């Protein structure tokens, strides 16, 4: 076993900080096959990936704006009922939808969209939709 390991690679020899020659492999090691990373392409505006992302972000913003999701001015109680409270944030929106609510709902919508896209890609359904 030790002779096989020593025969696979040679030890480089040094003189100071420089090597005499580059180490050469006496035997080639089998190449390891790597798993390809998955990628998502969003080629055009009407692509399925783009439609999924726009839909989930829009639905989450709609839910936050019209009181279907917790926001800065509506907190969720133990029974998941939403009750109004004063947050101290100024807004020009009649429903009280603030900038923080917009950013939070947009981020959650994107997270949901990415989860849906990657899930469909992993199951192979998104490949069938694309072509």
Swiss-Prot record:
| The keyword Thylakoid appears for this protein | yes
Pfam families noted in UniProt = PSI_PSAK (PF01241)
Question: What stretch of residues directs this protein to its organelle as a transit peptide?
Answer: 1-42
A Gene Ontology annotation in the biological process aspect, one of them, is:
photosynthesis
Question: Would the keyword Signal turn up in this protein's UniProt record?
Answer: no
Localization, per the record, is:
Plastid, Chloroplast thylakoid membrane
Topological type in the membrane = Multi-pass membrane protein
Supply the SUPFAM superfamilies for this chain: Photosystem I reaction center subunit X, PsaK
Alphabetical UniProt keywords: Chloroplast, Membrane, Photosynthesis, Photosystem I, Plastid, Thylakoid, Transit peptide, Transmembrane, Transmembrane helix
The family note in this entry says: Belongs to the PsaG/PsaK family.
The protein, known as: Photosystem I reaction center subunit psaK, chloroplastic
- Species annotation: Hordeum vulgare
This protein's gene is called PSAK
